[in-house]
Amino acid sequence: YAPKFLERGLNIPIHLAFSHDEEVGCIGVRSLIAKLANEIQPKPMMCIVGEPTSMEVIIGHKGKHSYECHVRGLEAHSSLAPQGVNAVEYAAEFIAHLKGMARRIRKEGPFDDLYDIKHTTVHTGVVTGGTALNIVPKDCRFEFEFRCIAGHDGRSLYEEAVRYAREELEPEMKLIDASTGFSFEELSVIEGLDMDPGEEVVTLVKTLAGRNDHAKVAFGTEAGLFQQDA
């Protein structure tokens, strides 16, 4: 389409932005947005992010906060299990707490009716730990995430979960061995998108798409980063 844009003799330029590693945390676009915000003048008026929406006009998506947790236990023979600290079992308690948070949010909200899933979600993915059935596992690692609607702070949910580990689980673990406990690493933070249906770019895209409706999606895109930082 670039040659067609040039043929039109446009008074307002159209910028094409290409990024990499969107699927693993929107990594590539961050430096591009910083350059866009600081070096390109005049600043572009609006941004359209292409996603597979069947031409549905999307005005919002959830933000994503993802983390890896490492539970450090104390290895022992399973016949002496009370003398060890079972990293897998403490990880399971923490994961069960995350599930409890998910149930609470599903019941109490907050809610946004434009989403198919109208509330923030909490999810645990990959879990690894243990070496053999007759050995109390000394390590367990797992990844979890919060996908948040606008106005629901993913960082505060993460801090709530960490408090549970620090206040409820670690004291019991450290009674047996002081070196045991939980550590957390942030994997990625993808900002959510939340637009007013009356914004100029929304009206333009609806005209281009030939439709009047709009919606929000649960998956993340680079659009939230453009909205916040560009």
Residue locations for each model-derived region?
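Acidic/histidine-rich catalytic neighborhood of metal-dependent amide-processing enzymes
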Residues: 1-66
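Metal-dependent amide/peptide-bond hydrolase catalytic core
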Residues: 68-230
